[in-house]
Amino acid sequence: MKKLLIGLFLVSSVLAFSERVVKGDKAYADDKGIVYVEGEKTPYTGVIEGYNAQGKLEGKATYKDGKMDGSSKLYYPSGKLQSEAIFKDNVQNGVQKDYFEDGKVKLELPYKNGKPEGTAKEFYPNGKLFVEATYKNGIKDGYEKSYYDTGALQSEKTIKNGKIDGVSKIYYPNGKLGSEATFKADVQVGVQKDYYESGKLKAEVPYKNGKADGVAKAYDETGKVIEQVTFKNGQQVK
């Protein structure tokens, strides 16, 4: 008898704490963003599921007292997981993960108090890192790097308050420097230098306030000047 009573208690506990599930077309949000189910006056607690015209699940989210609280997931038409995120009191926190349809991670984006915060990573379908960037208070700040699908560095730049600030570099697949330029608050300044894959200088173009300004030179791989053009405020001077 004791075992039977324990079993009944466990079953009743599971039922008591099982989540309620309603379809999205039965729910609505008021002007404060609080979610209710049609015909009910109490803010909704449970899971809301959204379906497409074909009746396939598109997404679902967990709510508590009318606010997103817990996991939120989106799905591909195939039913495979596309994206997942965590919310607390309608505010996104933790790492959002997006997936390719084969299940491999496509994006990892950390959130804090509803804004991106920390190092975000985007991946190629083969699992190699594609882009890596740092965020502060919802804005890119720090650095951004991109990679070839082989894993070799493709580009790197410094970012301050959402704008490129400092030296920006682009690399060949073999790792050799292809180009370097300087920016100040997203505006290109100084001399941009382009290189042959051998490492020899290919071109020099001076910039001022985001526009070519001064004498630009192109070189062959022996170092000989093969072209020289003068610019003023972005326009070629003839």
List where the protein language model places each region.
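Glycine/tyrosine- and acidic-biased, solvent-exposed loop/turn segments at the edges of beta-strands
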Residues: 14-238
